[in-house]
Amino acid sequence: MSTASTTHTQTDALQSDDLAAQCVDIARRAKAASRLLGTLDTNIKDQWLIESADALIEASDAIIAANQLDLENAPKYGLTDAGIDRLRLDEARIAGIATGLREIASLNDPIGEVLDGFARPGGMRIEKRRVPLGVVFFIYESRPNVTADAAGICVKSGNAVILRGGKEAAHSSRAIIEVLHEVGRRVGIPDDAVQLVGTTDRAAVGHFLKQSDNIDVTIPRGGENLIRRVAAEATMPVIKHYDGNCHVYVDESADIEMAVDIIENAKCQRMGVCNACESLLIHQSIAADALPAIAKRLASRGVEMRVDERASAYVPDGVPATDADFAAEFLGPQISIAVVDSLAAATDHINHYGSGHTDAIVTSNIAASEQFTALVDSSAVMVNASTRFNDGGMFGLGAEIGISTDKFHARGPCGLRELTSYKYIVRGNGHIRG
């Protein structure tokens, strides 16, 4: 059966009356495929990644044509400018996807790594060995590049993946999966290892979330409402973050030029992503000197500044901020700004309004940086660096499957190791317990 017919058959089946049974079937097939992937030789996984990267480049025209269909439908789905930006694919972005797959291939395979090993007094030997989680159910919205990223990182870490993309990127994701399946057949990775759910019916998500016998973890990546629904309904563990209300705090000892550059990058380099800066805090003793320069730079980039009463003295074009503004993930050309009395006031503000994603301090005082990193309760805390660096690629982890603000199992960028668990291998010589 051709890749296209496989995809379309799955789509038709999932749109039949027996949706629940079809979801169970997909999950069971993924579970079976995961047993193969867990023992697959690293060379085969890397071959699939490298050949898939090359094949995606070769298929650029077809993928861009499919993406154009999604872009034409974007107004019907009410996508914002930020959403359309996340949806758009061109040759450069496809090349970036291919580069990401090659980078994953270059990373060490975590599966089989011995984390610990020791011998008991009676001669019994015990190993703690890294193993895949099994099956990942990955839910995402209008980012077709994530289709390849998620497939790549799951296969390299020995996991099967069920991909449920948003309707906004349906054509793009299908075109990418067709390429990955064709390569998989050549190298020995079954279609069931990487399955794209062929319906946008929201009921399908609910059916998959009940499949704890076959699905080992769910990772939702999208809007807060989606993630809260998944967290409430899932019967298996969930790796997630709700939003990205990221802060930059300018300390009293900050280099002003550095602060201006970091804030511009954190806010403006790419506004529609979860690690973009949404809130600026500045120490009262440096506000008069630093805030006008920062405001001038942000204004030149078209950013609307929503300011508290104290900040308004230095930002005459600012809009009065509401309490909701300080908790907002704007994903666009807006930023909230507040003047604070101290570093402690800044960390209190961040821990109250923030989302535990990424927060930064600009300072020349080592003690201040240590205090900030100790007090801010986020997955990544930056010192004199943009919030935009909280990213699997920037951390050298390869393409990430998401960023977690949870504290159990995974926190921060979720790379290969975050998609693994471990088991104990015990070797005896006829040992019995007395």
UniProtKB/Swiss-Prot annotation:
Top-rank taxon, per record: Bacteria
Biochemical pathway: Amino-acid biosynthesis; L-proline biosynthesis; L-glutamate 5-semialdehyde from L-glutamate: step 2/2
Transmembrane portions of the chain: none
EC number: 1.2.1.41
Cellular localisation: Cytoplasm
GO molecular function, one term: glutamate-5-semialdehyde dehydrogenase activity
Catalytic reaction annotation: L-glutamate 5-semialdehyde + phosphate + NADP(+) = L-glutamyl 5-phosphate + NADPH + H(+)
Enzyme class: oxidoreductase
Family of the protein in this entry: Belongs to the gamma-glutamyl phosphate reductase family.
Function description: Catalyzes the NADPH-dependent reduction of L-glutamate 5-phosphate into L-glutamate 5-semialdehyde and phosphate. The product spontaneously undergoes cyclization to form 1-pyrroline-5-carboxylate.
Protein name stated in the entry: Gamma-glutamyl phosphate reductase
Name of the gene encoding the protein in the UniProt record: proA
